[in-house]
Amino acid sequence: MSTYFIGDIHGCFNELMHLLEKVSFDANSDVLWLTGDLINRGPKSLEVLRFVSSLGDNVKMVLGNHDVNLIALYASIKNSKKSSLMNNLLKSHDIDYLIYWLRKQPLFRVDHKKKIIMSHAGMYPYWDIQTASCYAKKIESMLCNHNYDTFLDFLYNNSDIKSKLYECTVFKNRELECLKLALNVFTRMRYCLPNGELDMTCKQSPSKNISSLLPWFFIKNSCLEDYCVFFGHWASLEKNITPKNIISLDTGCCWGGILSMFRLEDKKWFVQESEIKK
């Protein structure tokens, strides 16, 4: 049995299949960890969703921002981002099942035995693992609830909240505000300001010497020293810019880059060139 990690697929189904063929992936024994953003941008989002959902317990994925946005579109939430690709996906005959399956997926995964952490955008540097797990479980519970559309409506249509996670406590009166900020951490985070706020606009690589902004993985978090953190979301990151235990998996396949896969047991990388022209 082997354990594989793959970054943002974004509808690049052919590349995913070629990559799995390279390692003779066995869906009955191997385990596939995915950083989310299965859909949008690439041409075959529906095929990706159907394949990944068919893997059962042999896939361990987390939700990305595009996955959450698809759920919001399905629920007809105002201000969720529309595209022709997403609209076509919503017309598929099995969309009800696929959305139900997506709603059951987590935002944050931890394997304490293997010392693995995974979320789509990374780990907020001012949290410990227990705090991150607590926020994730609260949001996951909301998405699994039959009133999930009410929660998403709040997230998408009440945007006047600053991104200071350390000022929020999930068990106090501002619970929904805190959960909105936490969802941004799990699915959209890249940079933090010196005061701990998230910067939600800059997508450039840290090598561009952006003043006053720090990528989340450059802020020391002692609770992560014994863990390996896998994340996606940031296709513009340059190779080897993260600390050794922080592994970036989004290598821009949907932008004409490559789809990357990491095998845990021997720390070996595999790549597949994108079929999309730059």
From Swiss-Prot:
Official protein name in the record: Bis(5'-nucleosyl)-tetraphosphatase, symmetrical
UniProt entry tagged with the keyword Hydrolase: yes
Gene that produces this protein: apaH
Top-level taxon of origin: Bacteria
One Pfam family from the record: Metallophos
UniProt xrefs under SUPFAM superfamilies: Metallo-dependent phosphatases
Function as written in the Swiss-Prot or TrEMBL entry: Hydrolyzes diadenosine 5',5'''-P1,P4-tetraphosphate to yield ADP.
GO cellular component: cytoplasm
Keywords: Hydrolase
PANTHER family: BIS(5'-NUCLEOSYL)-TETRAPHOSPHATASE [SYMMETRICAL], METALLOPHOSPHOESTERASE
NCBIfam families: apaH (TIGR00668), PRK00166.1 (NF001204)
Keyword Thylakoid: no
First-level EC class: hydrolase
